[in-house]
Amino acid sequence: MASFTKTVLIPIAHGTEPLEAVAMITVLRRGGADVTVASVETQVGVDACHGIKMVADTLLSDITDSVFDLIVLPGGLPGGETLKNCKSLENMVKKQDSDGRLNAAICCAPALALGTWGLLEGKKATGYPVFMEKLAATCATAVESRVQIDGRIVTSRGPGTTIEFSITLIEQLFGKEKADEVSSILLLRPNPGEEFTFTELNQTNWSFEDTPQILVPIAEESEEIEAIALVDILRRAKANVVIAAVGNSLEVEGSRKAKLVAEVLLDEVAEKSFDLIVLPGGLNGAQRFASCEKLVNMLRKQAEANKPYGGICASPAYVFEPNGLLKGKKATTHPVVSDKLSDKSHIEHRVVVDGNVITSRAPGTAMEFSLAIVEKFYGREKALQLGKATLV
């Protein structure tokens, strides 16, 4: 019996842009693709951009004879240069092209890799804004589309376009119905590229000394896009972000089996003070947060001190609501668990700030959520600059 599984290769390297890589991995897996994450380094662990550590499924050197329906390259520097200089990857991508199978790339990778390898000749392509001149020298027409399809090559621009890019790849592999299904779960922005906004009530200043100290806990089956968006964006803003694992291992497998590495165990920072504690979602991940007494106690102390705390996706419903952390507050959460909120007046809002509490809905709102935190700490101008730089 013929198999209808679609196989995808995503190579990663030291200096890969983690939000792009993680979004591609998780969105394509949501669509039903069999995704292999392969390190082009000599070990499966890679140090991605912004101090984020990822663990691949395998080494590229072990699978060079494998055939995939799609090979998709993330960006980031120096990761994009490393991918370009990987001869094994170049050979695989060129064979992919000559055999008429799909190739895709985002950010700097269209110019650095696909363009350098001669695969964009006669094609329309897009990429990260600062690479457009280089891209124009390697393709027929460099365009500013958020996602560009030309034949069997798909290109895109940067972190903020990655989910749209990945949805397009699902459509190429599985058809529009599956793409629309995944898109509706993720809650993509209705107006990508426009200035982000959020709903704010009971406005208060979020204070900090020198640099915001922010805790991002992660647990088994946490939603990876939400976790990495928070860390990626907040570190771009120069906040001091600590990734802490709930459990006994620093290595955590997210809800879509992407492997992330925390810097500390939550137990090691349970007595420390933070300017913000902010939780990613994921249904099972949020339930693990809710069952972690130390984390719940930290959140209660944060609330008692009137210090900011936040959550996205299932975390407001499963962690905040049952522990009284939304009492008197307007909040939002993922649509599938919104019935658990006692006050449902703001559940359709993408990001809600009520005094010292910030909540949001889903992977598709994670960058807006992160930028809203930047705005609360640093002001609107810096948040808009980051939004522009990441192409939200």
Swiss-Prot record:
GO MF annotation: an example: glyoxalase III activity
Conditions for induction: By high light, copper, hydrogen peroxide, methyl viologen and cis-jasmone, but not methyl jasmonate.
A single cellular component GO annotation: nucleus
Record InterPro entries: Class_I_gatase-like, DJ-1, DJ-1/PfpI, Prot/Nucl_acid_deglycase
Cellular localization per UniProt: Cytoplasm, Cytosol; Nucleus
Main location: cytoplasm
Keywords tagged on the record: Cytoplasm, Nucleus, Repeat, Stress response
Gene source species: Arabidopsis thaliana
Protein name: Protein DJ-1 homolog A
PfpI endopeptidase domain residues: 6-174, 212-378
Complex formation: Homodimer. Interacts with CSD1 and GPX2.
